[in-house]
């Protein structure tokens, strides 16, 4: 018995098929699970009426064959040329089918690897999704709620601080208004004091002018007194000269009228002396009265000037103290305003920071929701891909089952047939019947593994015409 090379190819293809695919992977409940239990049987008439030619069916697990012509064996003699042509055609078809099956095996292996990878990703995404559904939202919600509570508490503290600052600001504003009112009053008093000072300066100037006028008058009166004294002295001298001359004349006249002239001269002298004394006394009294009046006026003006200077100094001291107080109040006001501005800026910055924190938390929450939605979409897309792969794998499984059912036809095992041929002896036909041997081989597979394998032979008699038609 000679073995044909196609039988080796069939065995190699079967081994390559099992080695390529192997046992299907055990996948998760939601993933693709490939389990199939296929039972197929094939029966083929493999015999002839000739006792010298026998055909035996070998093992097969090979790709589908494209030859549709049935193998016909003559009852008396095997046509080797026809078998060779069929064998060449079958080999070409088988090589093409082997290549196609190899490509299908590669694609199927790629799909299996892809399904495994997608199953791993699916399991990881399911774990992440369950964790995100079970923990992340609650934890994020707790974190957000805690952060919001802290922000609300800080906002309440800031609100109370703001109220306190506003109350303090209102009190400072009232104090500032009172200080402004006091400043206005002091400014008004200062203006009144300056006005009085101007008036006093005017009075002082008037008093100074009056004093100068009085001094000038005193000087003129002193000059007049000196002039009157000189005039009086000259008059006295003239009077003495006249008296001496009269005395000389009297001496001359005494001789004649001595008693009358003496009396007349005494009277005249007494009269002139009384007039001179009276004039001198009046001049002295007028001078003393004028001097006393001028002294009183000067004293009064000096007292008024002293009082004006004292009031001016007092007003200057008050103005200086008020100016210092106004400067201090102005500095206090500026410091309070600066502190108020700093508090407002600090409150605005803190409020902006809290608002930014709240916005950041809201953005993180939104991003978490978007990421969760994205994971859900990816999970849905993976489910869709999984369903498509399940459908495609089911389609390939059906195709493979169809191919397995087709390769179970004995024509595909033509390459594995062991043909023992002897030259038939020409004998006259004894009867019109011939025997045929039918070999039925049943193979049961599950998950790509051969579970059971059985063979059954049936022998029957047929007419020669039926055998030839086969």
From Swiss-Prot:
Residue segments, region Coil 2: 263-405
GO CC terms in record: axon; cytoplasm; extracellular exosome; intermediate filament; membrane; perikaryon; plasma membrane; type III intermediate filament
Keywords: Amyotrophic lateral sclerosis, Cell projection, Coiled coil, Cytoplasm, Cytoskeleton, Disease variant, Intermediate filament, Neurodegeneration, Nitration, Phosphoprotein
Domain IF rod: from-to ranges: 97-407
A Pfam family assignment: Filament
Positions carrying Phosphoserine: 28, 50, 59
Disease connection: Amyotrophic lateral sclerosis: A neurodegenerative disorder affecting upper motor neurons in the brain and lower motor neurons in the brain stem and spinal cord, resulting in fatal paralysis. Sensory abnormalities are absent. The pathologic hallmarks of the disease include pallor of the corticospinal tract due to loss of motor neurons, presence of ubiquitin-positive inclusions within surviving motor neurons, and deposition of pathologic aggregates. The etiology of amyotrophic lateral sclerosis is likely to be multifactorial, involving both genetic and environmental factors.
Cited function: Class-III neuronal intermediate filament protein. May form an independent structural network without the involvement of other neurofilaments or may cooperate with the neuronal intermediate filament proteins NEFL, NEFH, NEFM and INA to form a filamentous network. Assembly of the neuronal intermediate filaments may be regulated by RAB7A. Plays a role in the development of unmyelinated sensory neurons. May be involved in axon elongation and axon regeneration after injury. Inhibits neurite extension in type II spiral ganglion neurons in the cochlea.
Protein name: Peripherin
Organism: Homo sapiens (Human)
Biological classification of the source: Eukaryota, Metazoa, Chordata, Craniata, Vertebrata
Name of the gene encoding the protein in the UniProt record: PRPH
């Amino acid at each position: 018995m000679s073995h044909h090379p196609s039988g080796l190819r069939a065995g190699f293809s079967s081994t390559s098929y099992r080695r390529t695919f192997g046992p299907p992977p055990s996948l998760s409940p939601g993933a693709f699970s490939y389990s199939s239990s296929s039972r197929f049987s094939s029966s083929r008439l493999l015999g002839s009426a000739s006792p010298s030619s026998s055909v035996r069916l070998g093992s097969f697990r090979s790709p589908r064959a494209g030859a549709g012509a049935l193998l016909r064996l003559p009852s008396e003699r095997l046509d080797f040329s026809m078998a060779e042509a069929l064998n060449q055609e079958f080999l070409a078809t088988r090589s093409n089918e082997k290549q196609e099956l190899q490509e299908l095996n590669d694609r199927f292996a790629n799909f299996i690897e892809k399904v495994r990878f997608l199953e791993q990703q699916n399991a990881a995404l399911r774990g992440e999704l369950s964790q995100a559904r079970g923990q992340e939202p609650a934890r994020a919600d707790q974190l957000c709620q805690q952060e919001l509570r802290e922000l609300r508490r800080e906002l309440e503290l800031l609100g109370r601080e703001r109220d306190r600052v506003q109350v303090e600001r209102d009190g400072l504003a009232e104090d500032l208004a009172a200080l402004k009112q006091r400043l206005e009053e002091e400014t008004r008093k200062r203006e009144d004091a300056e006005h009085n000072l101007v008036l006093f300066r005017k009075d002082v100037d008037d008093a100074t002018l009056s004093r100068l006028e009085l001094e000038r008058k005193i000087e003129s009166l002193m000059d007049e007194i000196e002039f009157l004294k000189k005039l009086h002295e000259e008059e006295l001298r003239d009077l003495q000269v006249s008296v001496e001359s009269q005395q000389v004349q009297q001496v001359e006249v005494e001789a004649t009228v001595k008693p009358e002239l003496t009396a007349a001269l005494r009277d005249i002298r007494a009269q002139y002396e009384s007039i001179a004394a009276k004039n001198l006394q009046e001049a002295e009294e007028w001078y003393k009265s004028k001097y006393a009046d001028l002294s009183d006026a000067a004293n009064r003006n000096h007292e008024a000037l002293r009082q004006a200077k004292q009031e001016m100094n007092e007003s200057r001291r008050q103005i200086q103290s008020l100016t210092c107080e106004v400067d201090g109040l102005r500095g206090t006001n500026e410091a309070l305003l600066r502190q108020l501005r700093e508090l407002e800026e600090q409150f605005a910055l803190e409020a902006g920071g809290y608002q930014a924190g709240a916005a950041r938390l809201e953005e993180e929450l939104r991003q978490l929701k978007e990421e969760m939605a994205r994971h859900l979409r990816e999970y849905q897309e993976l489910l869709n891909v999984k369903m498509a792969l399940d459908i495609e794998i089911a389609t390939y499984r059906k195709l493979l089952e169809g191919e397995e059912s087709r390769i179970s036809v004995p024509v595909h095992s033509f390459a594995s047939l062991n043909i023992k041929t002897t030259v038939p002896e020409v004998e006259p036909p004894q009867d019109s019947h011939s025997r045929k041997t039918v070999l039925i081989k049943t193979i049961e597979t599950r998950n790509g593994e051969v579970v059971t394998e059985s063979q059954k032979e049936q022998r029957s008699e047929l007419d020669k015409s039926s055998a030839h038609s086969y």
